[in-house]
Structures are given as structure tokens and as C-alpha cells.
């Protein structure tokens, strides 16, 4: 079974959604046969690569809110994150461009498949939300990526050029083709789409449904009671 997850490094609900799908997988009987692949999505492709303002200020300006109103919204998200064991510092996060972070997530998949890609994704989310670091800054990105397991030389090569940019854009185009208007967005076996950071129970239901459909059980229409057969204890005579 394959789960594709579209998310952005600066999306607070994406980190929450990550924890919830992980919780669902922890209770899923066939979790060891599930592949999780991270896809790129940018909430604001035009955001600056050199940030100049806090996310809270940008949101207040964008939605016409007062600073107090923006703070209340952030407090609510932080409370939900805490329920999932996450520590957010939203009042300190910066409004920034995530294309380079996404390019390193693609590098993670190239170097170590879904497992290493997931480690890079987790490290970047933690750096942004828990540590309030500037994940558009190349020095920060290099430090986080190398600590997560990426090869330093390749990290430098990617950050110095445009490698994987087309992959990032292709992921975004695919999400739009699926009808996704926001993130997180989950697609299970290219068949079921789940929008938003749904409760773990919702993910569990979809996982069970998708698994049962891809691994159907044979319906037995006639049993041994109506016809002779052999079993562990011998054959009917």
C-alpha cells in the first residue's frame, strides 16, 4: 500500500497531520507493508527567500486581523499541536520561501528512499515549528539536512543550483490535478484522497478500507459440510 502526502514545511496543520497519520499507522496491522512518500506543496511560492517579517504579522495583514486576533488563532493551533505531542513557537516563525527545503526532501528520497526522505521532512518541520529556525537560509538547511542523514557534498550541490525544482513543481501540479486546494493532502493507493489533518481514526478507517479492497478475501459459497474433502486430520470417507 502506498500513501502520498502533500504538505509544506511551514504549514502548521501538516505537522499535526503527520503525527495523526503516524498514530493511525502505529495501530494498523499491515503497517510494515505501507510506503509513505512525501510530495511537495508551497502555500506561498512567492514568499521571500530572505524573510523580513514574522508569519503572525503576515497573516494579520493578509486576513485583515488585529495582532491580538492573529495571536488567538496561533494559540488555538499551538494547543492542538500540543495534544499531538508537538511544541510550536508560532509567534517566532518567519514568513519564508520553502522551495529549497522541498528540494532537499527530494534529495532525501534519491539518497535513501522513503525512510530517509521522511527523516529529512521531520527534521525540517521540527526546525521550523519547534526551533523557529529560518529554513530558507542555506546554512540552516545544510545543518538540518546533514544532521538528518543527507550527504554533505550533495546538499551543497543541490543548494548551489536548481536541482529538483522541476520535481517540486510537478508535485504541486499533481496535487492541483487531484483537486487539492490546500494541505495536508493524503492519497492512499492513488484511489482515496483525504484533505486536512483529520483525526487518526479517520486515517485508520481509510487504511482498513483500502487494504481490504486491494487484498480481497475469497467468499466461500460451499463448505466441506456439503462435499467430501481432506483436512489436517485426514480425509472424509
Where are these regions (language model features)?
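Structural alpha/beta surface segment adjacent to cysteine/selenocysteine redox centers
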Residues: 19-127, 230, 235
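Short, well-ordered beta-strand elements
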Residues: 1-6, 37-39
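C-terminal cap of thioredoxin/glutaredoxin-like
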Residues: 3-30, 105-106, 110-237
Amino acid at each position: 500500500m502506498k500513501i502520498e502526502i502533500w504538505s509544506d514545511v511551514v504549514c502548521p496543520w501538516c505537522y499535526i497531520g503527520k503525527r495523526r497519520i503516524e498514530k493511525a499507522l502505529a495501530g494498523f496491522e499491515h503497517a510494515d507493508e505501507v510506503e509513505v512518500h512525501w510530495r511537495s506543496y508551497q502555500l506561498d511560492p512567492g514568499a521571500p527567500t530572505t524573510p523580513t517579517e514574522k508569519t503572525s504579522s503576515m497573516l494579520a495583514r493578509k486576513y485583515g486581523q488585529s495582532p491580538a486576533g492573529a495571536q488567538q488563532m496561533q494559540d488555538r493551533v499551538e494547543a492542538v499541536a500540543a495534544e499531538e505531542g508537538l511544541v510550536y513557537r508560532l509567534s517566532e516563525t518567519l514568513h519564508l520561501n520553502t522551495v529549497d527545503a522541498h528540494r532537499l526532501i527530494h534529495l532525501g528520497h534519491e539518497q535513501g528512499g522513503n525512510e530517509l526522505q521522511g527523516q529529512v521532512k521531520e527534521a525540517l518541520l521540527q526546525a521550523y515549528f519547534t526551533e523557529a529556525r529560518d529554513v530558507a537560509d542555506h546554512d540552516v538547511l545544510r545543518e538540518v539536512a546533514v544532521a538528518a542523514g543527507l550527504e554533505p557534498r550533495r546538499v551543497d550541490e543541490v543548494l548551489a543550483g536548481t536541482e529538483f525544482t522541476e520535481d517540486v513543481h510537478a508535485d504541486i501540479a499533481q496535487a492541483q490535478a487531484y483537486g487539492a486546494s490546500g494541505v495536508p493532502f493524503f492519497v492512499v493507493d492513488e484511489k482515496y484522497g483525504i484533505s486536512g489533518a483529520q483525526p487518526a481514526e479517520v486515517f485508520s478507517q481509510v487504511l482498513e478500507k483500502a487494504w481490504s479492497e486491494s487484498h480481497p478475501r475469497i467468499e466461500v459459497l460451499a463448505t466441506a459440510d456439503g462435499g467430501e474433502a481432506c483436512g489436517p486430520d485426514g480425509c472424509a470417507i
